[in-house]
């Protein structure tokens, strides 16, 4: 694979809590220059980034980040607002505690609700593999597919 082919699959990301708009502009410019798949940012900058990018590179954002330990309605609201502000893709973090408790229906519903909120836009599910057993990783692959998400990360 060439450098360009690899970069075309990369989400250029800045998710630090202290990220500023000038820093977001820098990664937007880098994403444009390098033809990345998207620029992935916190939801508070989605509207500005969409305007700044002017359709050149899709804007992606994260919901329930970084912990995933928030209620489903809040994640869905955050996702819906991001889409209304122009996000083309949403990455969500699962509720790892619910997975560890084997509350599979709750985890599935969490993903389903966010997918419903984003509609036909892309939903990627962050499962934090470093925190999961092999069995939990396998279970999450099934749950993510059943819930209708587009990607698992």
Regions of interest found by a model, annotated:
Residues 1-34, 38, 44-153:
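Alpha/beta enzyme core
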């Amino acid at each position: 694979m060439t450098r360009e082919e690899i970069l075309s699959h990369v989400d250029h990301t800045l998710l630090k809590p202290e990220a500023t708009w000038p820093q977001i502009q820098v990664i937007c410019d880098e994403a444009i220059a390098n033809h990345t798949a998207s620029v992935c940012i916190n939801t508070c900058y989605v509207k500005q980034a969409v305007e700044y990018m002017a359709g050149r590179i899709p804007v992606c954002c994260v919901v329930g980040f970084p912990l995933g330990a928030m209620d489903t309605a809040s994640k869905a609201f955050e996702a819906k607002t991001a889409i209304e502000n122009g996000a083309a893709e949403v990455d969500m973090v699962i509720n790892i505690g619910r997975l560890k408790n084997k509350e599979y229906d709750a985890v599935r519903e969490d993903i389903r609700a966010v997918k419903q909120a984003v509609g036909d836009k892309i939903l990627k599910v962050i499962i934090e593999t470093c925190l999961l057993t092999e069995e939990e990783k396998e279970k999450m692959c099934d749950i993510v597919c059943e819930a209708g998400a587009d990607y698992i990360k």
